[in-house]
């Protein structure tokens, strides 16, 4: 049975925006979440099976590697850069593109599965001294 994508989210200028809960429903049927956050933002990981990581600064060079035959839900931290990438992919001929409205921030607010990767947390007394925190074992 084909996925009736029109029943999910809302569409603005040809791009369909979906919520986190709707994304989970869609991923049960078909598709991948494409996380475009840079490595330093990956402290909170969406704890789901079908997720691929293509950092924002690299996806334009590697978009050809993405599957075209299934739904791709583009996500970042708050939904700004991911929207830009979703539009880029549509312009490159991808027809099954969705955008996660509000990004990981809204995903977490909705109580959806998130894992905290403590090895990626930063430490430092000011922004100029930030570095990865060393985890004592």
State what each model feature region is:
Residues 1-32, 39-71, 80-137:
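Rhodanese-like catalytic fold shared by cysteine-dependent sulfurtransferases
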Residues 74-76:
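Short, surface-exposed ligand- or partner-binding patches at beta-edge/loop junctions that are enriched
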């Amino acid at each position: 049975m084909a996925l009736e994508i029109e029943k999910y989210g809302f569409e603005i200028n040809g791009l369909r925006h979906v919520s986190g809960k709707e994304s989970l429903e869609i991923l049960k049927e078909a598709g991948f979440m494409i996380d475009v956050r840079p490595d330093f933002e990956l402290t909170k990981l969406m704890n789901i099976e079908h997720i691929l990581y293509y950092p924002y600064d690299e996806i334009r060079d590697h978009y050809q590697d993405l599957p075209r035959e299934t739904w791709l839900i583009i996500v970042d931290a708050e939904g700004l850069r991911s929207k830009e990438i979703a539009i880029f992919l549509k312009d490159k001929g991808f027809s099954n593109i969705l955008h996660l409205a509000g990004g990981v921030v809204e995903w977490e607010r909705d109580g959806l599965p998130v894992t905290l990767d403590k090895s990626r947390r930063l430490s430092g007394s000011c922004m100029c001294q930030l570095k990865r925190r060393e985890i004592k074992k």
